[in-house]
Amino acid sequence: MPLPDLARAIGLCYGRRRREVTKLVRLFEKADIWRLAFPESSERGVTMSTARCVWRTTLLLGLFMGLYAPVTNALSAQILGLSEATIEDINTAFNSGTLTSERLVELYLARIQAYDQDGPRLNAVLWLNDQALETARILDEERRLSGPRSPLHGIPVALKDNIDTADMPTTAGSLLLAGSLPPDDAFIVEKLRNAGAIILAKLNMSELASGVTMSSVGGFIRNPHDIERSPAGSSGGTGAAIAAAFAQLGIGTDTGGSVRGPTTANGIAGLKPTHGLLSRDGIVPLALSFDMAGPMARHVYDVAAMLGVMTGIDPDDVATSKSSNRFETNYTQFLDVSALGDARIGIARDFLGQDTEVDWIIEASLEAMRAEGATVVDVHFPQWLLDVKGDWYTTIRWREFRAQIPEYLATIGREYPKTLSEMVERSMKIMSLTPEGGTPNPTRWSLLVQEEESGTLDDHEYIAMKNYGLPMAQSIVAGLMDAQNLDAIVYPTSPTRPSLVNGGGGGGVSATNIANLTGFPDLIVPAGFTSDQLPVGISFLGRPFSEPRLFGLGYAFEQATKVRRDPKMTPPLLGEEIRR
């Protein structure tokens, strides 16, 4: 990372903490950090004294800006940009009469028009709810007469297109399911509507929640920070839409990192909950051993607020019984700016070393945690687990998709495929034709063949991994945390910057599927930006049902660093201010 950028980030992060800035400058000078930042200094004619001067100057500038930030903040305390406003801010505006749900929906629809249908054409939105404005008017009147149902009353939410909605198609991004209208809402969608949330849109995704970040229904999705970059998958449409402020809240699904990859790639916050905390009813399955819906938003506060609305025991999903007496209905109560003060954090260095700038940002994040009082220690996963985790995941994932997708297909119209074999047959026919209103996806459709040939749930290999491998992974990760009394293990959510849309760059060995193999929760918070202005996120992996603690830690980190920024491709539109 270029030295001025890194120094500015640190200066801004610690601008209101003079002692921490001084301490950090001395620490980095002692470590000769300018030598790492200017490795070619002698060739470029930059002396070490010049580098040191730049380092000090940029840090002092950051400190100056931080010290005067309270004055600026006081002047603008009553006005926020749309993307800056949390649910709490919006409810304050609702209560003061300066904002209505109808107006909020209009603001988001204008942004979708400007940046998804026109402009950079992010291609994140598949379907808009044509009743959204009318629903907003009804909810405004209800608020006036009887008050709000919940903090989500009148708040627009956008859903990944593999989550059932009875009033909009659910295709999982696939032409194989084009036009499918489910018989009812998914359990979590019903919970959202009952809380007064407005389902604004259905979002593009990696087809059938796997493969490249495109779908045969919607095509490729673009990253609002750089449209030549991928928003990652499979919840890429949700990640791009929330970063670009097409809705206040988004829902993705995560089987092997599909909430967390798009969260970090688009510079937002998100959560892969503990397996069983949220119902999977009405979600197109990929592998039920791993599948989990996850809230995504620009702010940790909003992620916490949305999660509490969706929890609860669902008789149609046996996994939710694990959350009995362990789920909360209000996670915002655990948001604590001082939560890092007594925390013990493990850094999984197994996932560093693949992108120097990502590593720099993670190291700066660790310093931020230490400055807030946290103790940070190194942890390492057993090498054998790192070696086998991919095979375990694929073995279970492919076989479960083959066995479980027919159960979902049985709930939709007779005109749709009813088995994986029928899906393969129809995909082959579509590829031989020129479909209207879609784009063939041979990469994902060829994977259907591999899934069909993968085996059954009776295979000894599957049984061994499911019944013995997964519990072993759980014991190992819990043991790592117990051995050092850790509150969370952190790591770069993606060890490299987002890949190009055409597939170049990105990749690397990721830790994300460890949270799926174990079923443990994983909270992602923005950590910074690379020199080419691409987002980097940091993951907080915790024990089962430790979401309250993770929210405290993540919120404290977010408030201490405040590195989130609006994507350059989707700037604010005129009149988007929220007046509280």
Which residues are covered by each model-predicted region?
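Short helix-loop capping/hinge segments that flank enzyme active sites or metal/cofactor-binding pockets
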Residues: 153-172, 334-348, 398-473, 478, ...
